[in-house]
């Protein structure tokens, strides 16, 4: 199989199996932009809620607006000043760590470093959350305004749901718009694999690719992790089994494709996963899948393109990653 650079981007969905894996997404807003990630978003009391909040010289005004602009891998820096917290969503952004938020910055110094002298005051926050927010560089002013008792109850419930994402969950039927904790429509939850299951202890995940091993009909989910790649066997989707994970450079985005070809000497299908990493310098990781279902390993690293957003296979059966008859398969590296 040859490897070529490509400026085109193709989107392929593997439909060989259904594996529902909610990793760290708990957001009722627009879907994250595919490429606009790993940025700092800036907030200042004298800013303006316009644009993407990613320019230190033109910060946004509110945490809620900055949160809506934020994508996976982003973080929010808040300048010194006074901020009124009067809605549940803003408080959830502050407390959940889905998008890390930190106070104590100086707009005049381009939000470069936090300093305890830069007082970022929050009012309207229930007292029970003051200590956690203090650890993030905020000073909480307790008053009778802002989030009321009912809203405080809602935020507690949201945080509890977020915390429950960190543990494994069994199958759950979609009933009245929910499958367990998860909103649903015409789709049941078969299982939930928390990030804590992976040996590399990732803080987030970013991609998933399905792999059907034609040798033994087993099925796998190959996941791009914040700090590597993991493989979960989902042959029985209600009882997923952790195979293993491989550490790599931290990044908010990886892309994965699998290629299988028949080895006439062993009379078996050999399979490899190709993994690119965006905003990184690790090249294309080639993972040996031939030892599944027992283990995975890195067979080599191709450093022709040390950073790339997408990887794509052409001239293959997209459901299996097997080359089509009488044509040569190609590996495309895009967005390098």
Could you describe each region identified by the protein language model?
Residues 61-81, 210-229:
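N-terminal, post-signal-peptide region of Sec/Tat-exported proteins
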Residues 72-100, 104-109:
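N-terminal extracellular ligand-recognition/capping segment immediately after the signal peptide
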Residues 44-46, 79-81, 104-105, 225-227, ...:
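Active-site-proximal beta-strand/loop segments in catalytic clefts of secreted hydrolases
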Residues 2-18:
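Bacterial N-terminal signal peptides that target proteins for export
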Residues 32-65, 82:
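Right-handed parallel beta-helix/beta-solenoid
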Residues 112-336:
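Feature marking well-ordered beta-strand scaffolds used for ligand recognition
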